Amino acid sequence: MMKTMRIAAIPGDGIGKEVLPEGIRVLQAAAERWGFALSFEQMEWASCEYYSHHGKMMPDDWHEQLSRFDAIYFGAVGWPDTVPDHISLWGSLLKFRREFDQYVNLRPVRLFPGVPCPLAGKQPGDIDFYVVRENTEGEYSSLGGRVNEGTEHEVVIQESVFTRRGVDRILRYAFELAQSRPRKTLTSATKSNGLAISMPYWDERVEAMAENYPEIRWDKQHIDILCARFVMQPERFDVVVASNLFGDILSDLGPACTGTIGIAPSANLNPERTFPSLFEPVHGSAPDIYGKNIANPIATIWAGAMMLDFLGNGDERFQQAHNGILAAIEEVIAHGPKTPDMKGNATTPQVADAICKIILR
């Protein structure tokens, strides 16, 4: 008997509450079309509204509750008028990433037909690559502190942490991803000419890992010139792997090069499936447009397609669903309907309706 995939749906804040239901609707249409079963259970916490009533972002047993699910489908978090961003983020998404060991942040970068590219002369097909970001260690640690605070002798120290286990596992994932793609090409982001300890170590581990993948063509590029080449020569990239900080920068720069960050998805993966992985749109909660029913649901729908691909773990039905949703997204982006951010006048549900109809036709 086919397993029903159990998914925790967390709308969060702002437009997350508008786009996530539309994503669920599209995923259920895909399940109907390609013959598998999904069940969704909505969680009302991991939101600033929950914080305003309870003084915390999530209940004490959040880990136990979410561990029962195969995946987490997330909307957006943040309402800075009532809760500072560092509280809402560290109290929800960053907890998920670290305590569920979601050490891979995966961001597809793809130029769709119908989206004007800000880079001169680039066409659909020219930009199609992945950014693989280390998601749990590196430059984003809480180690450090201040001394002589508030005086002219104040000193602030922020430590980076790179472990053999942490570096090797993100590199292994990136090389495996590159091996699965036709071009079999990998670029590693570094800055070993400036960060004299951590980045030479990173480079050493890349070189050591590459020995296990002789068919992969790889290189390393310093982060400054790599950013420039994202803009000037995006067609040269296939899989780009980076530490937490560099990956954070590149994973926003990449989608910006395709014309909009607003339709970009993100996956926070625990590849071993010991814990549930999380799938979300890159955009935030957008308080300025919440309630107007004009939020673009495409990033959430694309994130849902990534979730199906991951949950299927090679199952052809899930791969077909992923590809079918992407084809439907491409058709809607090219021909409409479009929300105002893409120079249209459609509502959030109207875009999802169109994608569902394409999937089910």
UniProtKB/Swiss-Prot annotation:
<dbReference type="GO" id="GO:0009027">
    <property type="term" value="F:tartrate dehydrogenase activity"/>
</dbReference>
<dbReference type="GO" id="GO:0005737">
    <property type="term" value="C:cytoplasm"/>
</dbReference>
<comment type="function">
    <text>Catalyzes the NAD(+)-dependent oxidative decarboxylation of D-malate into pyruvate. Is essential for aerobic growth on D-malate as the sole carbon source. But is not required for anaerobic D-malate utilization, although DmlA is expressed and active in those conditions. Appears to be not able to use L-tartrate as a substrate for dehydrogenation instead of D-malate.</text>
</comment>
<dbReference type="Pfam" id="PF00180">
    <property type="entry name" value="Iso_dh"/>
</dbReference>
<keyword id="KW-0479">Metal-binding</keyword>
<feature type="binding site">
    <location>
        <position position="252"/>
    </location>
    <ligand>
        <name>Mn(2+)</name>
    </ligand>
</feature>
<dbReference type="GO" id="GO:0006108">
    <property type="term" value="P:malate metabolic process"/>
</dbReference>
<dbReference type="GO" id="GO:0000287">
    <property type="term" value="F:magnesium ion binding"/>
</dbReference>
<dbReference type="InterPro" id="IPR011829">
    <property type="entry name" value="TTC_DH"/>
</dbReference>
<dbReference type="GO" id="GO:0051287">
    <property type="term" value="F:NAD binding"/>
</dbReference>
<keyword id="KW-0560">Oxidoreductase</keyword>
<feature type="binding site">
    <location>
        <position position="224"/>
    </location>
    <ligand>
        <name>Mn(2+)</name>
    </ligand>
</feature>
<dbReference type="InterPro" id="IPR050501">
    <property type="entry name" value="ICDH/IPMDH"/>
</dbReference>
<feature type="binding site">
    <location>
        <position position="248"/>
    </location>
    <ligand>
        <name>Mn(2+)</name>
    </ligand>
</feature>
<dbReference type="GO" id="GO:0046553">
    <property type="term" value="F:D-malate dehydrogenase (decarboxylating) (NAD+) activity"/>
</dbReference>
<keyword id="KW-0464">Manganese</keyword>
<dbReference type="InterPro" id="IPR024084">
    <property type="entry name" value="IsoPropMal-DH-like_dom"/>
</dbReference>
<dbReference type="InterPro" id="IPR019818">
    <property type="entry name" value="IsoCit/isopropylmalate_DH_CS"/>
</dbReference>
<comment type="similarity">
    <text>Belongs to the isocitrate and isopropylmalate dehydrogenases family.</text>
</comment>
<keyword id="KW-0460">Magnesium</keyword>
<dbReference type="GO" id="GO:0003862">
    <property type="term" value="F:3-isopropylmalate dehydrogenase activity"/>
</dbReference>
<keyword id="KW-0520">NAD</keyword>
<protein>
    <recommendedName>
        <fullName>D-malate dehydrogenase [decarboxylating]</fullName>
        <ecNumber>1.1.1.83</ecNumber>
    </recommendedName>
</protein>
<keyword id="KW-0963">Cytoplasm</keyword>
